[in-house]
Every structure is written in C-alpha cells, then in structure tokens.
Swiss-Prot record:
Belongs to the methyltransferase superfamily. Tam family. Pfam families: Methyltransf_25. GO terms for biological process: methylation. This is Trans-aconitate 2-methyltransferase. Its EC number is 2.1.1.144. HAMAP family: Tran_acon_Me_trans. Keywords: Cytoplasm, Methyltransferase, S-adenosyl-L-methionine, Transferase. It comes from the Bacteria. One of its GO terms (molecular function) is trans-aconitate 2-methyltransferase activity. GO terms for cellular component: cytoplasm. Its main location: cytoplasm. The gene is tam. It comes from Rhizobium etli (strain CIAT 652). It is an enzyme of class 2 (transferase). NCBIfam families: PRK01683.1.
Length: 256
C-alpha cells in the first residue's frame, strides 16, 4: 500500500501539533544523533532541526513517496528507506522520535524494547500514536467495510489495525531499561469544515487500507457509504462546522 504525501499534508498543521507537543517533553538540551522514525513528508523532522539544529538529524520511512517529499522539504538532511519492523541504529542515538507510525506495527512493544538498546545513556525514545479506534471516524470504517458489495473481501481478511496496549503495558515493558517514563493521553478537538473534510483527513491515513482492500472498482462507492455514516456521526455545530475528536497516546522514555 503506497502512501500519499500530498494527501497527508492537506491537514499538516493539525497533524504536526502532536509532534510538537511530543518534542516539547523531550528532556534533552542538545544531541549528537537523532532519527525521526516514520518521518513521513518531513514535518516532524523539521521540528527536531528547529530545536536542535540539523547536524546529526536524519529520518527514515518505508514509503518512497513520503521520502521524496521529505527530501524536497529538507534537502540537506539524510532520509533513508527502511523497514521499522527490523531497523536498528548502527550507532547509539540520543533521540529516537516516532510521531504517528508505530500504531501500524502490531509488534511495536517488542520494537520499543529493541530500540531502547539503540539509545545512548540518557537518550530518549519519544513516541506518539493515535488511540482512536473507538471513535466514530474509525467505527464507521468497519461498518462500511461490511455493508457493501465489497464486504466479502473484508470477511476473508480484516484490515483493522490492532488496538493499542494499555499504558501500564508500555510502562512495564520499558521500565527495565528506562530511568524515567512519562506516558499520557491528549484528546485533540479539531473543528472541521464539514463531514467531507473528515473523510479527506482519514483518506491520508486510517481509511487508506480500507480503500485499497475494497479495490479500485468500489473506491467511490465505499467513500460515499463512509461519508454518509460520517455525516450522521458528526452533527453540525452552530457555525456549520463539525468537531473531530482525536485521542492520542504519548510516551517519553529516558534510558538508564
């Protein structure tokens, strides 16, 4: 499944805010090496550079389209194609930063444990993941998946991502290697122009696996079914806008 940097950046300000909030809690004054894991189009990498300078900062992603966008955005920064499921730093890093990527990897608890080994003493693993499977935006994806002529494809194979573990599970897994762990949730409330705007948002991320699995022949029909459900789930406010509620989990682990 190929990602679209162009679709992703349609709501760049809203998508970048959690990365900014995560970086604000990183307790480092300086660093020699930082890697932006799942860097996407480079918006989060740019934040790291703004705070710490460009030297020693790099990004990696598995998607060629995202990497191309990141290289255009930050031509002086190294961006590498890599699989986060198996990647490990070749030398100790001071910061491993991951904004909205590990929710796609079911075994991310194991990966976090391994990444802690790739940090220098006092180094930081900083992670943010959407925790929104229980929101109407994502419940409607499952409803649409099993409602149309495409439903046989979803009965054979689910594309719903795995729910996140409870905060206690992340703490328990990391505390053996961490001197300090901060874990918190933030719920963002985004005023959107209308229900179609919510659809445009999730077309860049959570809805993509559903559209790909339904197949190109059913793409527009699936989107129409999904939009109808979103219109019912998100009533208009006094100014005609709708409110997208978006919970996210954050964790910052400092290595012993």
């Amino acid at each position: 499944m190929a990602w679209s940097a162009q679709q992703y950046v349609k709501f760049e300000d809203e998508r970048t805010r959690p990365a900014r909030d995560l970086l604000a809690q990183v307790p480092l004054q300086s660093l020699r090496r930082a890697v932006d894991l799942g860097c996407g189009p480079g918006n989060s990498t740019e934040l790291i550079i703004e705070r710490f300078g460009a030297e020693g900062v790099s990004g990696l992603d598995s998607d060629v389209n995202m990497l191309e966008a990141a290289r255009k955005r930050l031509p002086g920064t190294a961006f590498v194609e890599a699989d986060l499921g198996s990647w490990q730093p070749t030398e100790p890093a001071d910061l491993l930063f991951a904004n909205a990527v590990f929710q796609w990897l079911p075994d991310h608890l194991d990966i976090f444990d391994r990444l802690m080994d790739g940090l220098s003493p006092g180094g930081v693993l900083a992670v943010q993941m959407p925790d929104n499977l229980g929101e109407a935006s994502h419940l409607a994806m499952e409803e649409s998946a099993h409602a149309g002529p495409w439903k046989a494809a979803f009965e054979e194979k689910s594309v719903r991502r795995q729910p996140l573990a409870p905060p206690s599970a992340y703490y328990s897994r990391l505390i053996g290697k961490a001197a300090r762990i901060d874990i918190w949730h933030t719920i963002y409330n985004h005023p959107m122009a209308d229900a179609a705007d919510i659809v445009e948002w999730v077309k860049g991320t959570g809805l993509m696996p559903y559209l790909a699995h339904a197949g190109e022949a059913y793409r527009e029909a699936f989107l129409a079914d999904y939009l109808e459900r979103i219109e019912k789930a998100y009533p208009k406010m006094s100014d005609g806008r709708v409110m997208l509620r978006f919970p996210r989990i954050f964790m910052v682990a400092v290595k012993k």
